[in-house]
Amino acid sequence: MPSLLISVLFLHIAIYIINTIAASTIDSLLWLIYMKLPTSASCIAREQHQMKLEVVQLKREMNATSSQDEFAKWAKLRRRHDKALEEYEVKNKQFSRFKSFFDVAVKALRWAGTSGLIVFLQFWFSKTPIFTLPPSWIPWQVEWVLSFPRAPMGTVSIQVWGGACAVVVALIGEAIGATVRYLYASKDSMEAIKVGAGAVEKEKKRQ
């Protein structure tokens, strides 16, 4: 089944990209989008922001008021500040709990759409061969391993093919990442050498 073969390969590529590069970006983007919607969480976030501004403003007024010369005013500001700070901390804990719940839900949905889909495909197509090997091409023991757990002998199962795809994609991803890091490091080194050479040249001209 070429379509299943290609689907599993591209699904593993997508999983690697999402989990290695874009997971935090996707989570942050979904959170920003959710905060734009008229939900209870967005209301809590706005209230939290307003409370934070109020606490900061009262703190500034307290610092600008002398506790000795204007004790009555300072004490009143202190009480307002302490009350506002307490309310802000309660609201902040409420917001943090909701954010934690949102993060767990997003991670669960991401897993269901990537790794969970792989698990489903492996279960649903466990008896379906990805491709067939040439007859007597390899020992029967190896054929049994390649067809594990339920594919016909002489074929490659979706479990084995998926595992091979995951390993190869990870190796290629690591190689690309190492190459990119090396190129950036070389570029920074060349720029540092140019800057150093320019400084030496200017020093020679001054002399």
UniProtKB/Swiss-Prot annotation:
Pfam families: CHD5. The keyword Transport applies. GO terms for cellular component: endoplasmic reticulum membrane; GET complex. Residues 44-97 form a coiled coil. Its main location: endoplasmic reticulum. Interacts with GET3. This is Protein GET1. It comes from Paracoccidioides brasiliensis (strain Pb18). The gene is GET1.
